Regions:
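N-terminal loops that bind phosphate or other acidic moieties
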Residues: 2-136, 140-382
């Protein structure tokens, strides 16, 4: 029997790698003669960087770059070799340009810059990356990726050919996008952007109106931010010949989705699709007899491009049953049945506090895994 152990991280308590090892040890205990394959999984959100580096035996790097407020931050990123021996850099923009890097009182979407994310791209290329996977969740910025573009040599000039500064309210002074100093090392680099939203760049469902409030913008400021993104979108169309205003996902990360398409020719794809393709997961699981997955909580959100649901859907394609283990159940957890997670259990086995459950997560996962696996063994013997 071949068993795939493929959990996501249990947020706040266990990494995907830790969860994979615990469940694998339990499976080896109950099914000692089985073939076990551990595949820590992620969907492009928090923890994706470490999960991918662990899964590929890649290298976790740290670089000093500009943060969203132009102060220096130490940002982690990774580099690894794919199974096709392609060197890939993996970057989460939140590490360099994220909301979590700023105190609430310092949130400022007019001045927050994505420049540091561009610096991380350059570090990855300098270290040999031929492809970049960029996760763009959790941004503090609303600059349409102009900071990233500036970091790689693209200039944004006014009517007198002077560079315009990074304040978004000044973007209407930009009259020309100049690519003369664009870093030539990037011309042959492939970019994939993990993007799980469909918001366009501008309008009531765009970057500024939907995400501006969480970045510190009030209603009047949101109008200004949106107006300036519209201006930049039209300028990109005029100077670069690319219409980013109608791109689904263009409004992600304060317009970075649109900027990555315009300046780098990036492809915007659901994060889980990028990760699963990169790790060649479908090929690895298609001859399995059982899949075990898990995450911190199973609820209705688990059905939206989350890694456990994605691997269960692959299992369903090949008639492989999937069982799931989660920290807890939330509203809508039962809907996972139709996605292929046919049996589910939680780590919680007695009345206890959240802190206790988090602190004891390793032991709780061990108990839950053993009980699930023993039930499977009983069923096999009926």
């Amino acid at each position: 029997m071949k068993i795939i152990i493929a959990p996501q991280s249990f947020k706040g308590s266990l990494t995907a790698k830790e969860a994979t090892k615990i469940i694998s040890d339990c499976a080896r205990n109950i099914f000692p003669d089985s073939e076990l394959l551990g595949i820590p999984i992620a969907d492009g959100g928090d923890g994706t960087l470490e999960t991918i580096i662990d899964a590929t035996n890649g290298k976790l790097m740290n670089s000093q770059v500009k943060g969203p407020d132009n102060s220096f931050v130490k940002a982690s990123w990774g580099i690894f070799n794919s199974e096709k021996n392609e060197k890939i850099g993996i970057i989460e923009m939140a590490r360099a340009s994220g909301l979590a890097l700023l105190e609430p009182k310092k949130l400022d979407p007019f001045n927050a810059t994505s420049f540091g994310t561009g610096e991380l791209i350059l570090h990855a290329v300098k270290n040999g990356a031929k492809k970049i996977i960029l996760g763009i969740g959790g941004s503090a910025t609303n600059d349409c990726g102009i900071g990233v573009a500036k970091a790689v040599g693209i200039k944004f000039l006014d009517s007198k050919n002077n560079e315009v500064n990074d304040n978004v309210s000044n973007f209407s002074n930009i009259k020309k996008i100049n690519l003369d100093n664009f870093d030539t090392r990037l011309k042959d680099i492939k970019f994939e952007v993990a993007c799980d939203v469909t918001n366009k760049l501008c309008g009531n469902e765009g970057a500024s109106y939907i995400y501006g409030p969480q970045k510190g913008a009030d209603p009047e400021e949101i109008k200004i931010l949106d107006k300036n993104l519209l201006y930049i979108g039209n300028l990109i169309k005029k100077d670069l010949g690319i219409n980013v205003l109608n791109i689904k996902g263009g409004g992600a990360a304060g317009g970075l989705g649109a900027g990555m398409v315009a300046f780098f020719g990036a492809k915007l794809k659901p994060g889980v699709d990028i990760i699963f393709e990169t790790l060649n997961i479908e090929e690895k699981i298609k001859d399995a007899n059982l899949i075990i997955t898990g995450e911190g909580q199973f609820d209705i959100s688990s059905t939206y491009n989350k890694a456990p649901t994605a691997i269960a859907k692959l299992g369903k394609k090949y008639d492989i049953p999937t069982i799931g283990i989660s920290g807890s159940f939330g509203d809508g957890f039962e809907k996972l049945d139709k996605f292929g997670i046919l049996s589910k259990t939680t780590l919680i086995n007695k009345i206890s506090s959240l802190d206790d459950n988090i602190n004891n997560a390793k032991e709780l996962l061990k108990v839950a895994s053993l009980e699930q696996l023993k039930a499977i063994k009983i069923g096999m013997n009926l």
